[in-house]
Regions:
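General small-molecule cofactor/ligand-binding pocket signal
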Residues: 12, 88-91
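Conserved Class I S-adenosyl-L-methionine
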Residues: 58, 65-87, 93-145
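A short, conserved alpha-helix within the catalytic core of class I
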Residues: 33-47
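Short, charged, surface-exposed secondary-structure boundary motifs
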Residues: 1, 21-24, 61-68
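A short acidic, Gly/Pro-enriched loop at the edge of an enzyme's catalytic core
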Residues: 17-29
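Conserved beta-strand signature within the Rossmann-like core of class I S-adenosyl-L-methionine
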Residues: 48-61
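Class I SAM-dependent methyltransferase SAM/SAH-binding core
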Residues: 1-19
Length: 145
């Protein structure tokens, strides 16, 4: 979709830990809900290049966790610092969504909860006709030093 909207731009989808670009090539990296590959990000970003790192906010999918677990938990919110980067901004975006039954399994499969939820929790989720849940995204902006 992005390539169609801005055909003059260049896009790549790859492993965070082995990106198919030359050293110092990127002006901007976007890393959504993926591991922080610090060495690779430092390699591919030009000096002064920026990275937007998207992590879950405290209440992200909290109501889903309330279905899955006996004791649901909030995501930890912490200040994050990485060598070689300066934190230059942060914004949190929150909302509430209603996920119909047909899309619940796909959403569940995109989360780390899919791999560690007891069978009973997964069965409770699968039995729902829909799920109304909070979403919360933290956009952390860093600049390469």
């Amino acid at each position: 979709l992005a390539a169609k909207a801005l055909p003059a731009a260049r896009y790549a989808v790859a492993s965070s830990f082995s990106q198919p670009v030359r050293t110092g090539w990127a002006d901007l990296l976007l890393n959504c809900f993926s591991p922080f590959a610090q060495e690779e990000f430092l390699r591919v970003l030009r000096p002064g290049g920026r990275m937007i790192y998207v992590v879950p906010g405290a209440e992200h999918l909290y109501q889903m966790k309330a279905v899955l677990y006996e004791k649901p938990y909030k995501n930890p919110v912490q200040q994050i610092a990485y060598d070689g980067f300066a934190a230059i901004g942060e914004r949190e975006v929150t909302g509430r969504i209603t996920v119909p039954h047909e899309q619940l399994e796909a959403l569940f499969a995109m989360t780390p909860y899919y791999w560690k939820t007891p069978r009973g929790g997964a069965e409770r989720l699968a039995a729902l006709s829909q799920l109304e849940t909070d979403i919360s995204f933290r956009f952390l902006v860093f600049e390469k030093l």
